[in-house]
């Protein structure tokens, strides 16, 4: 009986880590109190995993901010600007993730990128010319010792050296090969220390191997591991992969002197085929059979069919990836049992892994019978009218006329905006008062009339403030919305909403993805009321703010009984109806956010178009294809790497696109120029995910850099994302500087 998981959620059952850490950020508790609370949380989580009967428990999967950042700190991959800050280790650690602005200095946060095809974001380390890779941290050892004191001999988890190098940035003139020997020495020192502490096995996460690999990348991988595994310091090595299959290196991988290999049998298209072709008898196979990214119950019969085909003798059942990507437990939900029985969050997935192992070993007949019964019953019916509407779509439904160049001229005449028009991405700070009023309204303590009056007053205040500082295109602030997906889902059929289904997105920020239960249609107008109200309060244009269909799908837990393409088209038709209602209400600039467009892009380039972009881009076009030429369509995208899909983004046929660029040093601009990008662009001129306020002249320099790459007539000036999570003082100070910088830049044109 051998079972494990790749990793466990770390925010806590009720987001305890988030709230404690935020108290620390506000200086309400000490560093010692934060560390003590985190220690208690780790003990609680280890105990849950143990009590569920999981036989191998991981450690060091916990993080105060991000596991990739933990590895950077462990191996001294820290910029000199942060190394030199006169701060504690923990303060420097947080400075890397959040930036630091205070009496000890002023440093920007490191860039942040999507973690493969998930909604989790990792902090991107940077190798500089003087970076000295060495063992500098002790977290992995401390947490192993903590668990040992609780009577648990855990398996420490660490990002592998290949993935670390592949996903990091490098200063000009610096390359990954420069650090092979120093990384090998540092990892071997980790091995030795863990062995001395009594560890028997370490898990090295090498998810980068599921992507397309060049000959040079394969050579780097083999060079690293041939050297590293030459001396394992008496420790067994589990080579763990997830998010896909390792077809490019499988033959090499099985011949490396590792002791165990973890493979993904959920998302790995070719994993079963590879293993059936042969797996070494002297190695243990960790079978990722329970989906770590979705919340539906595992179909035991289907999983057992896969397990029966695996020829390996030594098997450990595990999750397909870390359970970080699903909520904590269904125990705190209020769904009817008929609904709840279909869901498995992190704690319930422990049960599933244990059940499958028991069934495989001739036990667990009751669990198998109950699971069969669950899947034998039809879960939900279909909407025949909606299915017919989709079946009737033609190419014309995906094509906006006239073409972009003609629309651009029409809109220039219609809006008469200045050069370098200024705007924001949509949301303004959601203060304690805003959240308290929303909660009171939900509880029935505030009437509809009272709540509407509060929202109107708040919108009025921010519309006037935007006019006072002379923004060109305004937003209403989204004060009525709790979340950019849940708010829409609450007005769509086919959606369910958890009470406590939080999932970590970046740092201490959690999101609560809704669940797509059935067919999706719009129940009523969603945004028209407040967007049209805001427009009535000013003569300047106010953007209508919508979330696009691909993002709504990608930031929800999708159905598994129909394709994500079909689900997305259903959502697209619902949002299309909303776009047309906004236009009819006099809202002439409509932003359709596709923040998560890249999120489900297949990790292998050969699958990009056929499996995703060939339907995701048309789904966006479907939403806006029938608006008038003088209605301007904006879209926005968040932290992702877009440079390799620029033609697809241009093909969305929006009129303006804004995107994150500040943390990544505007690298995307070179690609826009090279690809002759036609859509007008708003590269984010400052990073809103850090509380840091841009220095005097900082935004001016960013605008200057943008104008060196993009014609001024194509450029908009905006922050890189919405301002919902920021405080009012820092928001206003930053936006005043943004408007001033835009005006100064206009003077130079």
Swiss-Prot record:
The active site is at 689 (proton donor). GO terms for molecular function: 5-methyltetrahydropteroyltriglutamate-homocysteine S-methyltransferase activity; zinc ion binding. 5-methyltetrahydropteroyltri-L-glutamate binds at residues 15-18, 114, 555, 599. Keywords: Amino-acid biosynthesis, Metal-binding, Methionine biosynthesis, Methyltransferase, Repeat, Transferase, Zinc. The keyword Nuclease does not apply. Pathway: Amino-acid biosynthesis; L-methionine biosynthesis via de novo pathway; L-methionine from L-homocysteine (MetE route): step 1/1. Transmembrane segments: none annotated. CDD domains: CIMS_C_terminal_like, CIMS_N_terminal_like. Its cofactor is Zn(2+). One of its GO terms (biological process) is methionine biosynthetic process. Coiled coil: none annotated. Zn(2+) binds at residues 636, 638, 660, 721. Its EC number is 2.1.1.14. L-homocysteine binds at residues 425-427, 478, 593. InterPro entries: Cbl-indep_Met_Synth_N (IPR013215), Cobalamin-indep_Met_synthase (IPR006276), Met_Synth_C/arc (IPR002629), UROD/MetE-like_sf (IPR038071). It catalyses: 5-methyltetrahydropteroyltri-L-glutamate + L-homocysteine = tetrahydropteroyltri-L-glutamate + L-methionine. It holds the Pfam family Meth_synt_1. L-methionine binds at residues 425-427, 478, 593. Binds 1 zinc ion per subunit. It is an enzyme of class 2 (transferase). Belongs to the vitamin-B12 independent methionine synthase family. Catalyzes the transfer of a methyl group from 5-methyltetrahydrofolate to homocysteine resulting in methionine formation. This is 5-methyltetrahydropteroyltriglutamate--homocysteine methyltransferase.
């Amino acid at each position: 009986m051998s079972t494990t998981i790749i990793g466990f959620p770390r925010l806590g059952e009720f987001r305890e880590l988030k709230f404690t850490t935020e108290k620390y950020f506000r200086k309400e508790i000490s560093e010692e109190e934060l560390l003590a609370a985190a220690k208690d949380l780790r003990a609680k989580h280890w105990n849950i995993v143990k009590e569920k009967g999981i036989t191998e428990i991981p450690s060091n999967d916990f993080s105060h901010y991000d596991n990739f950042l933990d590895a950077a700190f462990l191996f001294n991959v820290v910029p000199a600007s942060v190394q030199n800050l006169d701060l504690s280790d923990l303060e420097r650690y947080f400075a890397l993730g959040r930036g630091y602005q205070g009496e000890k200095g002023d440093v920007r946060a490191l860039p942040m990128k999507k973690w493969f095809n998930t909604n989790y974001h990792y902090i991107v380390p940077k190798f500089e010319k003087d970076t000295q890779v060495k063992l500098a941290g002790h977290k992995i050892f401390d947490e192993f010792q903590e668990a040992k004191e609780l009577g648990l001999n855990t398996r420490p988890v660490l990002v592998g050296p290949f993935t670390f190098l592949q996903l990091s940035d490098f200063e000009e003139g610096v390359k990954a090969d420069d650090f092979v020997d120093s990384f090998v020495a540092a990892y071997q020192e980790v091995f030795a220390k863990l062995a001395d502490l009594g560890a028997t096995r370490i898990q090295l996460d090498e998810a980068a191997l599921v992507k397309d690999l060049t000959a040079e990348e394969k050579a780097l991988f083999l060079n690293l591991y041939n050297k590293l595994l030459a001396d394992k310091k008496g420790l067994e090595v589990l080579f763990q992969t997830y998010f896909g299959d390792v077809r490019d290196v499988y033959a090499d991988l099985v011949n490396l002197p590792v002791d165990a290999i973890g493979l993904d049998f959920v998302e790995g298209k070719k994993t079963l085929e590879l293993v059936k072709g042969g797996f070494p008898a002297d190695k243990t196979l960790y079978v990722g059979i329970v989906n770590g990214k979705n919340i539906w119950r595992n179909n035991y019969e289907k999983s057992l069919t896969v397990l029966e085909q695996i020829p390996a003798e030594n098997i450990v059942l595990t999750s397909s990836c870390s359970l970080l990507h699903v909520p904590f437990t269904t125990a705190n939900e209020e769904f009817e049992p008929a609904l709840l029985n279909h869901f498995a969050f992190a704690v319930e997935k422990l049960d599933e892994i244990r059940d499958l192992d028991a069934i495989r070993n001739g036990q667990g007949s009751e669990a198998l019978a109950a699971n069969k019964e669950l899947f034998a019953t039809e879960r939900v019916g279909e909407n025949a009218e909606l299915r017919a509407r989709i079946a009737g779509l033609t190419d014309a439904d995906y094509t906006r006329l006239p073409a972009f160049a003609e629309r651009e001229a029409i809109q220039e005449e219609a809006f008469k905006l200045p050069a370098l028009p200024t705007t924001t991405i949509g949301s303004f700070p959601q203060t304690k008062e805003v959240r308290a009023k929303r909660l009171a309204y939900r509880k029935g303590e505030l009437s509809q009339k009272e709540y509407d009056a509060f929202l109107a007053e708040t919108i009025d205040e921010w519309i006037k403030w935007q006019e006072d500082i002379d923004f060109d295109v305004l937003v209403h602030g989204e004060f009525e919305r709790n979340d950019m997906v849940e708010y829409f889902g609450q007005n769509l059929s086919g959606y369910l909403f958890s009470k406590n289904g939080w999932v970590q997105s970046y740092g201490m920020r959690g999101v609560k993805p809704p669940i797509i239960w059935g067919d999706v249609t719009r129940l009523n107008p969603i945004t028209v009321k407040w967007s049209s109200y805001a427009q009535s309060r000013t003569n300047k244009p106010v953007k209508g703010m919508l979330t696009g269909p691909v993002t709504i799908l990608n930031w929800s837990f999708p159905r598994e009984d129909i394709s994500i393409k079909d689900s997305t088209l259903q959502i697209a038709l619902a949002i299309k109806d909303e776009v047309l209602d906004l236009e009819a209400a006099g809202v002439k600039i409509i932003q359709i956010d596709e923040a998560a467009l890249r999120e489900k892009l297949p990790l292998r380039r050969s699958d990009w178009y056929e499996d995703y972009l060939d339907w995701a881009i048309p789904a966006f076009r479907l939403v806006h294809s029938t608006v008038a030429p003088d209605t301007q369509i904006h879209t926005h995208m968040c932290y992702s790497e877009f440079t390799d899909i620029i033609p697809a983004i241009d093909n969305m046929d929006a009129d303006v696109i804004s995107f994150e660029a500040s943390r990544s040093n505007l690298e995307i601009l070179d690609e826009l120029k090279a690809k002759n990008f036609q859509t007008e662009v708003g590269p984010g001129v400052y990073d809103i995910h850090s509380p840091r306020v841009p220095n005097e002249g900082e935004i001016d320099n960013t605008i200057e850099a943008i104008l060196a790459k993009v014609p001024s007539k194509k450029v908009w000036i905006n922050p890189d994302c919405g301002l919902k999570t920021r405080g009012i003082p820092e928001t206003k100070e930053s936006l005043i500087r943004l408007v001033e910088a835009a005006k100064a830049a206009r003077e130079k044109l």
